[in-house]
């Protein structure tokens, strides 16, 4: 986990290993961050990643297969609390 400042905005980066498959992690990400969850707009989904925007910030998630689970990388601006909640769910 770490923070980096780019272009005047502070972004946080998080990583986690999950026992869920990459497809299931992305499905849960859309449920959690999308219109039926936190309410962010789904900007992109596919190819092992998804991005969400809204409220002056964003969430980007990239998922790679790792053994029987997934290696999950998240980047966010303004949605740190929600990203931490999501990481606890996967």
Placement of each model-derived feature along the sequence:
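Mature extracytoplasmic or otherwise solvent-exposed domains
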Residues: 15, 51-53
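Short, exposed beta-strand/loop patches in secreted or surface proteins that constitute
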Residues: 38-43, 52, 62-63
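Terminal, regulation- and interaction-focused segments at domain boundaries
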Residues: 2-42
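Beta-strand/loop substructures that line and gate deep hydrophobic ligand-binding cavities in soluble
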Residues: 53-90
């Amino acid at each position: 986990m770490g923070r980096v400042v780019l272009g005047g905005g502070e972004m946080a980066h998080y990583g986690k290993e999950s026992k869920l498959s990459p497809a299931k992690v992305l499905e849960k990400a859309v449920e959690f961050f999308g219109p039926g969850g936190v309410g962010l707009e789904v900007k992109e989904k596919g190819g092992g990643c998804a991005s969400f925007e809204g409220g002056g910030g964003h969430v980007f998630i990239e998922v790679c297969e790792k053994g029987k689970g997934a290696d999950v990388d998240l980047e966010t601006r303004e949605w740190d609390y929600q990203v931490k909640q999501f990481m606890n769910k996967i």
